[in-house]
Amino acid sequence: IILLFIICGFSPLIWAVDGCNQERLSPEEFRAKQKAFIIEKAGLTKEEAAKFFPVYFELQDKKKALNDKAWGLIRKGKDDKTTEAQYAEIMEGVYDARIASDQLERTYYEKYKKILSNKKIYMVQKAEMRFHKELLKKAKK
């Protein structure tokens, strides 16, 4: 879950690799590739995709905001003068952001159920994880 939390937060910044050429994707390009991948792998119809992706990307935006907040806290800890009490505050904030992200996932699952079957939701989740895994593999090459 933590890895997925980090990947989702930085996903628009990941480099995509086509052959030997590395190309930085804009957030819009990243979303377009992600959407196409998920539609194909999860077998979404045009109607399902049209209803699903606005809700899906709304969740991604909210999770990114939480992730940005967590990373902001982590950066505060780089100062050598950070006290133990400040580290405690940082870690509380990071864990609170992770919990909030998980709660958002649960809330949006309920929204997804109004659009897709549970099987399709499962297929979307599987496709999303595969998409990020493939991006990371390509980025390592």
Question: Where are the language model's segments positioned?
Answer:
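Amphipathic alpha-helical segments
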Residues: 34-115
